[in-house]
Regions:
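Conserved catalytic cores of phosphodiester-cleaving nucleases, focusing on short active-site segments
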Residues: 22, 42-44, 49-60
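Nucleic-acid nuclease catalytic cores
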Residues: 79-118
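Non-catalytic C-terminal interaction segments of nucleic acid-processing enzymes
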Residues: 65, 112-137
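Short, well-ordered amphipathic alpha-helices
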Residues: 73-79
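Acidic-basic catalytic patches of nuclease active cores, encompassing PD-(D/E)XK
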Residues: 1-34
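Active-site-adjacent loop/helix micro-motif of nuclease/hydrolase catalytic cores
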Residues: 60-71
Length: 137
């Protein structure tokens, strides 16, 4: 068993707002969702699927940095917090659209992706198929 040390992490209001808003969407979509599961941002469960969700704020248009951080954090948390024989499905949540190349990169890593739109949530095909987003990008 690995222990992750407690530390103070500064999170922006954008991050907190994104997590809260998406958590509300998950509840409406009949997921059991948790938003207070430190160090994870969100966890969700529906129909026997457990999802580990990492939320990322895209700062100054730097999608690449946010995507790389999401990949690293999802891999780390899945490894440290879940048994090897009971790994969660993984999803990255962003404050804005990330573009086709990054959607495909995340999919290649087995990670679904989602971001807000004016009228709901868009995402990768995996996210839409799982009910984590309303429409494909």
């Amino acid at each position: 068993m690995q222990t992750i040390s407690a530390r103070v992490i500064k999170k922006s209001r954008k991050h907190e707002t994104l997590v809260k808003r998406y958590g509300a969407f998950l509840a409406e979509a009949k997921f059991s969702a948790g938003t207070n599961v430190h160090p994870r941002d969100l966890v969700a469960r529906r129909a026997g699927d457990d999802w580990l969700i990492e939320a990322k704020v895209i700062r100054r248009g730097n999608v690449s940095h946010a995507v790389r951080e999401a990949i690293g954090q999802l891999a780390t948390y899945a490894f440290l917090l879940y048994p090897a024989d009971s790994q969660p499905r993984r999803m990255a949540l962003f404050t804005e659209a990330i573009g086709d190349v990054y959607v495909r990169l995340l999919s290649h890593q087995g990670i679904a992706s989602v971001w807000p739109t004016e009228d709901g949530w868009a995402g990768s095909p995996e996210a839409v198929n799982a009910g984590l987003a309303q429409k494909e990008a």
